[in-house]
Amino acid sequence: MNYGFNVDFLSNKYGDFFIWRSPGEAYRPSPFTNMGRESNNFRIDPFFNFTNPERGTSHKVKGRFYYSADNVVRPTQSASITDILGNMGTDAQVIQNIANGDYTALQPLMTGVIKWLGSDKLSDLMDGVFGSLDNIFPNATTADYCDLISWVMSNGLPSDMGGLLEGKLPSDLVPWLSGVLNPKRNQSPTRMDKNYDYYLDYQFNKKWDGGAQITTGLTYEHIRTFSGETEEVHQSDNVAAYMQYDQRFWDRLSVSAGVRAEYYRIDKHYREADTKVFGSKIPFRPVFRAGLNYQLADYSFLRASFGQGYRNPSITEKYLRKDIGGVGVYPNYNVQPEKGFNAELGFKQGYKAGNLQGFADVAAFYTQYKDMVEFQFGLFNNADLSMINSVTDAIQMLKNGKGFGIGAQFHNVSKAQIYGMEISTNGMYTFNKNAKLLYNLGYVYTEPRDADYKKRNALENTYTDPLQMKEKSNDGKYLKYRPKHSFKATLDFQWKRINIGANVNWKSKMLAVDYIMLDERSKSEPDLLDYVRGILFGSSNGETLASYWKKHNTDYATVDMRFGVKATKEVAFQFMINNLLNKEYSYRPMAVGAPRTFVVKMDVTF
């Protein structure tokens, strides 16, 4: 019998961002996503184990209480309105002339409107818009316009702006100016997100002399989440019963089969899933799995497995409004559970030659999903948290007056297939009793297919609204944010108390990304969303997100090095160089890998 508990506490504060300021300022956040988080996390894991060797039984109880509290912070100071207008080179005289009825500066806009009405080419209108803006803000960059839009979204404008046309000042001009000059008055209160997680698992195991054993148990988990953004409380309960039977035959063949039945609910939705049994629906969802492992010879193993999968959307995916890295997570009450199955066939072979020994493994896998849950990035109306999916939606957002948000919403992909193979080897070469080389090499090939892409493309080809969101950046058959090939190698040379190691990571290009970021389809001229992307994601010296991604969405490899020494039994030091070759790479749009980084680490064991 043994029992005890583990306790963890973590407090951190960090800045992160999902959208860059521009291709020329890739490591600076966009003003729309200038956010970080500070958080405190506490966890206690009690456990109790009792084993009776004479009866071949064991009882295990595991528990967990987890609490987290975090809130949004701004890691960098937002620019003031005077700084923004100064950076844009604002021509006050031009603004005064317009107020006095001299519209010469707006001539490019008027010309563009006339050309657009005659040619129906959006580029004529947009050239006129930006031509007039250049007269007012001659030094402005796309990032400066983002600063201005972000400032207006945060501070608002005086009411009764329409009265200026009649020579009347807004009635709340003085309070508004006071807020501009004293921005601390406009700071929003801290909005803290809190999460409570209670978990309990009981497991019973019985072994027989003939090589059979059975494992069964019960699991209960209760989660309570408070959103500081919407001031809503959501609760979920997950109850599961499981059983697995294992049998070994002839000292070579091991067979296992198991079933798990789950009940899940959120708030008052007591039946998140149903299963029909003898014509009646019960609120439990069973999943099955089975596998076998056969020892062909010494250090040679053949394995096969099959398992069903079922996952209910989490509270965050379905109900919460949350900011992560400055990008909002928006609720989708219609997201459904994802389900599927996975099959794998593998072969593992041990080898030894002199001082070299290790294992090689080859496996093929196939996974199929129905209603697979994926996130989709887009623009959202902060008034009702809905996705902006048309010009009408955008107009409604402007009327609501709470601005727009950039974020992600979880939704279902009707059908997905992911299959491929994995080859790996790991082992050790011993030079002498003081020196050895450890290695781990692995290659993965994946085909991540959207099985319904043709049907979706046919539907998207009927879209006529210029702001209607499509699923991904191209018409291809692949799922978003997945490469086809990846390779990883880890080497560690150990000599007495010294170790020298290296990591090599290689990945192929990304196959597709979100439509809001890029549209890789061929077109005769830019559409409205291309201009929206140009403002939101910036441009620098003619470089846009699209051109940057086209240049950097390629195969890439990174190399990390480390050197360590164990000074005493309790104290060890390690010096690391990450991205040794200072490779510039991008693993998703606006996510540029960290440059060469030096890290010093000390480990102390008590």
Predicted feature descriptions by range:
Residues 2, 51-56, 209-211, 248-254, ...:
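Outer-membrane beta-barrel channels and translocator barrels
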Residues 251, 363-368, 386-516:
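Gram-negative outer-membrane beta-barrel transporters
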Residues 310-311, 371, 377-380, 505-546, ...:
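C-terminal beta-signal and adjacent terminal beta-strands/loops
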Residues 2-14, 34-273, 361, 420-425, ...:
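Face-selective signature of the C-terminal outer-membrane beta-barrel domain
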Residues 60-64, 295, 301-305, 336-407, ...:
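Membrane-embedded beta-barrel scaffold of Gram-negative outer-membrane proteins
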Residues 195, 207-215, 219, 223, ...:
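Structural signature of Gram-negative outer-membrane beta-barrels, strongest in the C-terminal barrel
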Residues 9-13, 65-71, 220-226, 231-233, ...:
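Transmembrane beta-strands of outer-membrane beta-barrel pores
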